[in-house]
Amino acid sequence: MKSFYHYLMKYRHPKPKDAISEFANHAYLDHGFPKASTHYDEISSYLELNGDYLSSMTTFDEAWERYISETKR
């Protein structure tokens, strides 16, 4: 299974259209982001402590749900 970070990068966009695209752009610039992780708790904990660029954890939860549904096929 590819990492959440790898999945999220498909949403990067020079002119973000939505909150997930903004999240992807910021995660790309965040050198401490757990890039190899596939674990919700690890990424969620990291974002709660370091994800000041994330306006709401709901954005992460929505991106995580997409990740799970698309990578579990």
From Swiss-Prot:
Domain of life from the UniProt record: Bacteria
Signal peptide from the UniProt entry: none
Family: Belongs to the UPF0346 family.
NCBIfam families: PRK13672.1 (NF010193)
Protein name stated in the entry: UPF0346 protein BLi02292/BL01432
Organismal lineage: Bacteria, Bacillati, Bacillota, Bacilli, Bacillales
